[in-house]
């Protein structure tokens, strides 16, 4: 069952957090290649899970998550200023690696397709040689 108010609130929080990360946070630990993938607000509106994707190496990911965790109080205040709700939800950042996994799977599939194409070409060449 979908809750329209929770969905609207999630979308609004996503905009606020994206804007805050892009324009207001000055923490050098936070990578410029950080994006908000998804925002889930609990039904009781007390907590918000913010799924973040960071393109970069493991150190950049860890540094970005540390910076975002330290800035969660600031981001919570920004959310509180801009939404009308009885409670301002507690912000919880979580690393989402689905984009990296998708890129990895795409590369694996591409490699397998190339290998299959090459093996088909080799088998066609041997058949052509045997016909002569």
UniProtKB/Swiss-Prot annotation:
Its main location: cytoplasm. Pfam families: RBFA. InterPro entries: KH_dom-like_a/b (IPR015946), RbfA (IPR000238), RbfA_dom_sf (IPR023799). GO terms for molecular function: ribosomal small subunit binding. Keywords: Cytoplasm, Ribosome biogenesis. HAMAP family: RbfA. Belongs to the RbfA family. Monomer. Binds 30S ribosomal subunits, but not 50S ribosomal subunits or 70S ribosomes. This is Ribosome-binding factor A. It comes from Alkaliphilus oremlandii (strain OhILAs). The gene is rbfA.
């Amino acid at each position: 069952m979908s809750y329209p108010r929770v969905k609207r609130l999630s979308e609004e929080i996503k905009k606020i957090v994206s804007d805050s990360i892009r324009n207001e946070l000055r923490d050098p630990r936070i990578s410029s290649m950080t994006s908000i993938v998804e925002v889930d607000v609990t039904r009781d509106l007390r907590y918000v899970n913010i799924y973040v994707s960071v393109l970069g190496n493991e150190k950049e990911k860890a540094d970005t998550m540390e910076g975002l965790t330290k800035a969660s109080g600031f981001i919570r205040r920004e959310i509180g200023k801009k939404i009308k709700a009885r409670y301002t939800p507690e912000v919880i950042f979580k690393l989402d690696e689905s984009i990296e996994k998708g890129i990895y799977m795409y590369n694996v599939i591409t490699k397998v397709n190339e290998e299959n194409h090459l093996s088909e070409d080799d088998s066609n060449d041997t058949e052509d040689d045997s016909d002569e």
